[in-house]
Curated annotation (Swiss-Prot):
Gene (name only): VP30
Main function: Multifunctional protein that acts as a viral transcriptional activator. Promotes read-through of an RNA hairpin in the NP open reading frame to enhance viral transcription. Mechanistically, nonphosphorylated VP30 hexamers form a ternary complex with the viral leader RNA. Clamps the RNA template and the complex VP35-polymerase L together, thereby increasing the polymerase affinity for the RNA template to increase transcription initiation despite the presence of RNA secondary structures. Also assists stop-start transcription at gene junctions to promote transcription of downstream genes.
GO molecular function, one term: zinc ion binding
Protein name: Transcriptional activator VP30
Region (Interaction with the nucleoprotein), start-end ranges: 180-197
Gene Ontology biological-process annotations: symbiont-mediated suppression of host innate immune response
Source domain of life: Viruses
Lineage: Viruses, Riboviria, Orthornavirae, Negarnaviricota, Haploviricotina
Length: 288
């Protein structure tokens, strides 16, 4: 009798163990199978190749950095500037909210447009000009020499009063000359531009971006966007500053290239150049 009870107890305990542990084993195996299938499915979806559309041209308009502004200090103090010699920016849009409120508080906003120096609108159709817009017949062949001579001529001119066609051509001239500089010289070009215009370092990012994007501009898209989005005064200031700066800067940064080209320069040109680093100039009474 006792043996029969022990057998019954052991049989019942084994059955309880199987009932308690069985579902756990099955659950683990199910979850393991599920994770492996998920892993396989995720791998398979990541390996699926999505067809790529090539040669798709962007139709959106290019974003142009804001034009560098050097606001007139008289305007910032809340007074209208009536000086004919002030070459600072006089557009009210350049003022902060506080400065504009100060100007309104002084009741000076009722002045004429001439005192605010508001520039005339430009011809937006010239953003993408044709050869007919410039009306040139039998013009001379454009060479590097003629390009530099043209830049030297316009650097000494007042371009504030030129017509839209000439201003648009001057923007193209600037873009062409920017691309004659090596890419490593663009930061130096930017620094010289800031110094000439007395602009702060807060304007450096936008000025450098303009030079970089003009340098890599293909098809004149960025050049056209500048014409469309910048006002006439900003274009005039930028072009004028660039033409002065570009003719004074080295267009190459490689010392090997510079020294090699200096070797070929005519004597009259070499006499006016400072000695290259590492070179020594000897006078008649110098001794070794």
């Amino acid at each position: 009798m006792e043996r029969g009870r022990e057998r019954g107890r052991s049989r019942n305990s084994r059955a309880d163990q199987q009932n308690s542990t069985g579902p756990q084993f099955r659950t683990r195996s199910i979850s393991r199978d599920k994770t492996t299938t998920d892993y396989r499915s995720s791998r398979s979806t990541s390996q699926v190749r999505v067809p790529t559309v090539f040669h798709k041209k962007g139709t959106g308009t290019l974003t142009v950095p804001p034009a560098p502004k050097d606001v007139c200090p008289t305007l910032r103090k809340g007074f209208l500037c009536d000086s004919n010699f002030c070459k600072k920016d006089h557009q009210l849009e350049s003022l902060t909210d506080r400065e504009l409120l100060l100007l309104i508080a002084r009741k000076t906003c009722g002045s004429t447009d001439s005192s605010l120096n508001i520039a005339a609108p430009k011809d937006l159709r010239l953003a993408n000009p044709t050869a007919d817009d410039f009306k040139q017949d039998g013009s001379p062949k454009l060479t590097l020499k003629l390009l530099v001579e043209t830049a030297e001529f316009w650097a000494n001119q007042n371009i504030n009063e030129v017509d839209d066609a000439k201003l648009r051509a001057l923007l193209t001239l600037s873009a062409v000359l920017v691309r004659k500089f090596s890419k490593s010289q663009l930061s130096q070009l930017c620094e010289s531009h800031l110094r000439r215009e007395n602009l702060g370092q807060d304007q450096a990012e936008s000025v450098l971006e303009v030079y970089q994007r003009l340098h890599s501009d293909k098809g004149g898209a960025f050049e056209a966007a500048l014409w469309q989005q910048w006002d006439r005064q900003s274009l005039t200031m930028f072009i004028s500053a660039f033409l002065h700066v570009a003719l004074q800067l080295s267009c190459e940064s490689s010392t090997v290239v510079i020294s090699g080209l200096r070797l070929l320069a005519p004597p009259s040109v070499n006499e006016g150049l400072p000695p290259a680093p590492g070179e020594y100039t000897w006078s008649e009474d110098s001794t070794t």
